[in-house]
Amino acid sequence: MNSVIFLGTPQFGATVLEGLIKAGYHILAVVTQPDKKVGRKQKVVYSPVKEVALANDLPLYQPVRLSKSDELDELLQLDADFIITAAFGQFLPTKFLKSAKIAAVNVHGSLLPKYRGGAPIQYAVRNGDAETGVTIMEMVKEMDAGDMYAQASLPIRPDETSGEVFEELAPLGRDLLLETLPKIASGEIVKKPQDPSQVVFSPTISKAEERISLKLTAKEAKNLIRALNPDPGAYLVIKGQRLKVWKAEVADDNTSLPAGHLLTNQGRFAISFAGNTVLNLLEVQPNGKKAMAIKDFLNGQGKKFAAGEKIVDED
């Protein structure tokens, strides 16, 4: 079986790596991002890919930056048939990509050339797309610009979050990769170049974009909330306090109130948005507290708000 250097970090990558192991590929090395410290206690957390590597006693590398590192020199000496990445999160040096004896291959979470970059799934959900997919592609120096070996599509349900789409895309990408690698090795597959006129970029979501703008319609706000669930979460600033919103729905009613006003806090928490639209908040998380259903939030804080008043601060 062919030899592989695998690079990945989140669960998406871990699912792909597990598939390669079960299929019998010879994993020469696993490369993942350095451990993170999270929470108040700064607990060290391993990436899902690291967990898989440790469970299977695979050689593990965690460079802060692969380019010009000692780890890169070691990896270049491994002489792998395939270099395979799945949501790794770092730029890869061209000389490393060219060192693969057969091919350097990426499992990308979109239907390229749409959504090149680090946040393809979040962009698909935020833009309200009806479908997304995975692309098995050749890696080149330019980000996500290589020729395509294969694609598979996946519908996005109207209420689905990025996290849920990720969970469905991972096995789809794994299976498509395992189906495609033998065809690459045998030379029977024909690569397809990307149409440069159809390229759309999906750079990492910025901190500023996490705030739900009052310039959005209720539908656009709902899509942003879905896109940033489970990480990092979208939020409103209500009377000076940050309130994360994990789930919301577009209300059937419209309003003449300007954006940012409370329609009602009786039985629901309905806020006006652009275009006379209304958003019902369904699950929220006040600062320093756990996520809660809107009825629990209203039981504790509902009396602070009056129907008809402006409660959302301008962004």
UniProtKB/Swiss-Prot annotation:
Keyword Transferase: yes
UniProt key word Coiled coil: no
Taxonomic classification: Bacteria, Bacillati, Bacillota, Bacilli, Lactobacillales
GO CC terms: cytosol
Enzyme Commission number(s) of this protein: 2.1.2.9
Positions annotated to bind (6S)-5,6,7,8-tetrahydrofolate: 110-113
InterPro entries registered for this protein in UniProt: Fmt, Formyl_trans_C, Formyl_trans_C_sf, Formyl_transf_N, Formyl_transf_N_sf, Formyl_transferase-like_C_sf, GART_AS, Met-tRNA-FMT_C
UniProt cross-references to HAMAP family, sorted A to Z: Formyl_trans (MF_00182)
Family annotation (NCBIfam families): fmt
Protein name: Methionyl-tRNA formyltransferase
Entries under SUPFAM superfamilies matching the protein: FMT C-terminal domain-like, Formyltransferase
Keywords: Protein biosynthesis, Transferase
Main EC class the enzyme belongs to: transferase
Gene3D superfamilies: Formyl transferase, C-terminal domain, Formyl transferase, N-terminal domain
Taxonomy, superkingdom: Bacteria
Protein purpose: Attaches a formyl group to the free amino group of methionyl-tRNA(fMet). The formyl group appears to play a dual role in the initiator identity of N-formylmethionyl-tRNA by promoting its recognition by IF2 and preventing the misappropriation of this tRNA by the elongation apparatus.
Protein family (similarity comment): Belongs to the Fmt family.
Listed Pfam families: Formyl_trans_C, Formyl_trans_N
Catalysis performed (reactions): L-methionyl-tRNA(fMet) + (6R)-10-formyltetrahydrofolate = N-formyl-L-methionyl-tRNA(fMet) + (6S)-5,6,7,8-tetrahydrofolate + H(+)
Transmembrane segments: none
GO molecular function, a single term: methionyl-tRNA formyltransferase activity
